[in-house]
Amino acid sequence: MLFFSYFKDLVGQEVTVELKNDLAIRGTLHSVDQYLNIKLENTRVVDQDKYPHMLSVRNCFIRGSVVRYVQLPKDGVDVDLLHDAARREARGG
């Protein structure tokens, strides 16, 4: 649940989601659920030449199991807080 809580705090910020098929989509994080399914708004494809058929997509739902990486905004990451939460989760409490 660590990452679910973390991503919930990022709602409203711009993120880039890279999928396992190498498609990278940048957009505003609208919502995330416990399965780490992601809903983005105001989306745009990072490599528009490679994926021209995706140019008209403005909102999308991404299944969590197809996500390879999520790139976060630099100011959206509190590293100390994330380390503390990871330690607490690893200890089971």
Swiss-Prot record:
Record's protein name: Sm-like protein LSM2
Subunit structure: Component of the heptameric LSM1-LSM7 complex that forms a seven-membered ring structure with a donut shape. The LSM subunits are arranged in the order LSM1, LSM2, LSM3, LSM6, LSM5, LSM7 and LSM4. LSM2 subunit interacts only with its two neighboring subunits, LSM1A or LSM1B and LSM3A or LSM3B. Component of the heptameric LSM2-LSM8 complex that forms a seven-membered ring structure with a donut shape. The LSM subunits are arranged in the order LSM8, LSM2, LSM3, LSM6, LSM5, LSM7 and LSM4. LSM2 subunit interacts only with its two neighboring subunits, LSM8 and LSM3A or LSM3B.
Disruption phenotype: Embryonic lethality when homozygous.
Family matches, as SMART domains: Sm
A single GO BP: deadenylation-dependent decapping of nuclear-transcribed mRNA
Subcellular location(s) per record: Cytoplasm; Nucleus
Keyword Membrane tagged: no
Tissue expression: Expressed in roots, leaves, stems, flowers and siliques.
Function: Component of LSM protein complexes, which are involved in RNA processing. Component of the cytoplasmic LSM1-LSM7 complex which is involved in mRNA degradation by promoting decapping and leading to accurate 5'-3' mRNA decay. The cytoplasmic LSM1-LSM7 complex regulates developmental gene expression by the decapping of specific development-related transcripts. Component of the nuclear LSM2-LSM8 complex which is involved splicing nuclear mRNAs.
CDD domains, per the entry: LSm2
A Gene Ontology molecular function term of the record: RNA binding
Family to which this protein belongs: Belongs to the snRNP Sm proteins family.
SUPFAM superfamilies, alphabetized: Sm-like ribonucleoproteins
Domain of life: Eukaryota
Recorded GO CC terms: Lsm1-7-Pat1 complex; Lsm2-8 complex; nucleus; P-body; spliceosomal complex
Occurrences of domain Sm (ranges): 2-76
A Pfam family recorded for this sequence: LSM
